[in-house]
């Protein structure tokens, strides 16, 4: 069975976010549709409707998990599920019907949904990968050069696929950028897989030409966005010195539980997360 890697990013503005994160969610092909269906049902369960119906576009993690969400969620005691769903649904249907209770219910529903989505992904055997870049990291100047965060992410994908018994093929699924940015990324990815020794090796298991999709129509790219945002603001590996948001601790734990980890017979440990302090290609 093949694996699809749904990829999204967080913190690319290099302003407010403490880290720039490129995250990938790997799902076995036969698990994709059941996971999507259950996530759709979960949105109905927590909000009384699909989030796309509510917002008319992708519900980004920045909207679901920002500080305001947690502040509003905590301004009252936990609301019983049925009442919480009803109140959240009422506010999503008509944003002018603002009450303290509805705002609280919507905040609590957003957090509960994100936690449920991450745990659901794990129950379907999904694993996550991420490259984590400080805002101050030097960046490449040549447009044709693939940044290190992409190269390291592909490396982690390859390790994962190569260690599976059937050595399945992997497909790259990116959130669609503007057309010119897509062409630039396609060229960079092609150069990596065709012109570098590591890339040619990894092309044995990773299809070198990625697919681009609209994230507001692709549920699992949205889930990768939740992973990327949570890592940027909530996960802290040993070398990550920026402060985290304490209210994201539970979600950070859910993301860490999804991280790819493998111990080789040699004792070497392979992991899905990598902190990169310099994005310029080697040499």
What are these regions, as identified by a protein language model?
Residues 1-283:
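Phosphate-ester processing/binding pockets and catalytic centers
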């Amino acid at each position: 069975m093949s694996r699809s890697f749904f990829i999204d990013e967080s913190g690319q503005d290099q302003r407010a976010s403490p880290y720039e994160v490129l995250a990938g969610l790997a799902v076995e092909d036969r698990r994709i549709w059941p996971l999507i269906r259950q996530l759709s049902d979960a949105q109905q369960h927590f909000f009384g409707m699909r989030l796309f119906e509510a917002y008319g576009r992708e519900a980004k993690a920045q909207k679901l998990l920002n500080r305001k969400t947690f502040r509003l969620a905590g301004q009252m005691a936990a609301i019983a599920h049925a009442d919480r769903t009803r109140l959240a649904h009422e506010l999503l249907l008509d944003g002018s019907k603002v009450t303290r209770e509805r705002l609280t219910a919507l905040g609590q529903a957003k957090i509960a949904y994100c936690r449920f989505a991450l745990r659901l992904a794990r129950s379907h055997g999904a694993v996550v990968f991420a490259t984590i870049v400080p805002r101050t990291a030097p960046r490449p100047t040549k447009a044709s050069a693939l940044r290190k965060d992409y190269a390291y992410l592909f490396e982690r994908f390859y390790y994962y696929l190569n260690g599976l018994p059937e050595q399945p093929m992997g497909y790259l699924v990116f959130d669609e950028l503007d057309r010119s940015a897509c062409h630039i990324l396609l060229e960079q990815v092609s150069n990596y897989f065709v012109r570098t020794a590591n890339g040619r090796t990894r092309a044995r298991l990773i299809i070198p030409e990625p697919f681009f999709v609209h994230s507001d129509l692709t549920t699992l790219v949205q889930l990768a966005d939740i992973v990327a945002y949570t890592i940027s603001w909530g996960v802290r590996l040993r070398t990550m010195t920026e402060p985290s948001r304490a209210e994201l601790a539970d979600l950070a734990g859910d993301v860490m539980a999804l991280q790819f980890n493998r111990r080789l017979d040699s004792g070497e440990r392979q992991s899905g997360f990598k902190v990169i302090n310099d994005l310029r290609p080697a040499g």
